[in-house]
Curated annotation (Swiss-Prot):
This is Ribosomal RNA small subunit methyltransferase H. It comes from Alteromonas mediterranea (strain DSM 17117 / CIP 110805 / LMG 28347 / Deep ecotype). InterPro entries: RsmH, SAM-dep_MeTrfase_MraW_recog, SAM-dependent_MTases_sf. Specifically methylates the N4 position of cytidine in position 1402 (C1402) of 16S rRNA. PANTHER family: 12S RRNA N4-METHYLCYTIDINE METHYLTRANSFERASE, S-ADENOSYL-METHYLTRANSFERASE MRAW. S-adenosyl-L-methionine binds at G37, G38, H39, D57, F82, D104, Q111. Belongs to the methyltransferase superfamily. RsmH family. Its EC number is 2.1.1.199.
Length: 313
């Protein structure tokens, strides 16, 4: 099996993230998606001797990669998804004391590039797709038993694939005779099922995305993680979230907007502005930030990234 450190990962919107977090030398920060530690390394560079960085990741290979920071007493990592952030930070006695939370969503380059992880339709490997390979159901196991209607819904809803019904039907027809266990096998089934090809995207792009999001409960994790971030952040603490597709970005944008609203009251009710504002949790900072043309030229995978930043009130 190919080792994870053979795959290079370039952190996206790196300088923009560090600026967004407005790092205090002695602050306490969370890298909610450690990956291969690119953002963590730069946060540590910005921290002073008394600063602290707590990282989260559910990928065992990411936990292994974090060993490079083992000698830095300011750093610690928790092998859990960021959906567990509220409970883990409460256990450390740090709820309401975190100065910044960074979330870099989606799949990392090492996960995509390692065929054995089963995320890529361009590299043949076991059809796995789990962020944490030590638990949960693989994509192959789910596709072997899922109802056609459920497969359709997942591919349409999470993959935003208009040919979801055709693809699901092809999957169910194929598995009657042959187990679907390889990424190349699934990609071929999808390719043959999609009647109209997008010249800018591989036919399997959206379906693979949808299945991956479902297998890892990514959107539910994001909802829980965003709420957890507001719970652990100190007043004026920063939340910075990088998303890579419209489902994630819409969810993040809506969350920040909803948390920035005050109390909703009838128009003629005698209530002060202070009482209305009391329910506000976050304040959006600036507009969505996208990578520069230079960054996209250096790292094509950054092209769809969007950074949104908010501050705890």
């Amino acid at each position: 099996m190919t080792q994870p450190n053979e795959f290079k990962h370039i952190s996206v919107l790196l300088d923009e993230c560090i600026e967004a977090l407005a790092i205090k030398p002695n602050g306490i920060y969370i890298d909610a998606t450690f990956g291969r530690g690119g953002h963590s390394a730069h946060i540590l560079d910005a921290l002073g001797e008394k600063g602290r960085l707590i990282a989260f990741d559910r990928d065992p290979q990411a936990i292994k990669a974090a060993e490079r920071f083992a000698d830095d007493k300011r750093f610690s990592i928790i092998h859990s998804p960021f959906g567990d952030m509220a409970e883990e930070i409460e256990a450390l006695g740090l709820t309401g004391k975190i100065d910044g939370v960074l979330m870099d969503l989606g799949v990392s380059s090492p996960q995509l590039d390692d065929a054995e992880r089963g995320f890529s339709f361009l590299r043949d490997g076991p059809l796995d797709m789990r962020m944490d390979t030590s638990r949960g159901q693989s994509a192959a196991d789910w596709l072997a038993s899922a109802e056609e209607q459920d497969i359709t819904q997942v591919i349409k809803e999470f993959g935003e694939e208009k040919f979801g019904k055709r693809i699901a039907h092809a999957i169910v027809n194929t598995r009657k005779d042959t187990p679907i266990t390889r990424t190349a096998q699934l990609a071929k089934i999808i390719d043959e099922a999609v009647p109209v090809k997008d010249k800018f995207k591989h036919p399997a792009t959206r379906a693979f995305q949808g299945i991956r999001i479902y297998i890892n409960a990514e959107l539910e994790q994001l909802r829980v993680g965003l709420k957890a971030a507001t719970q652990v952040l100190a007043k004026e603490g920063r939340l910075a979230v990088i998303s890579f597709h419209s489902l994630e970005d819409r969810l993040v944008k809506r969350f920040i907007k909803d948390q920035s609203k005050g109390k909703v009251v009838p128009h003629n009710l005698p209530i002060t502005q202070a009482e209305i504002d009391a329910d506000k949790v976050l304040k959006a900072l600036g507009k969505a930030i996208k990578p520069s043309e230079q960054e996209i030229a250096n790292n094509v995978r950054s092209r769809s990234s969007v950074l949104r930043v908010a501050e705890k009130l």
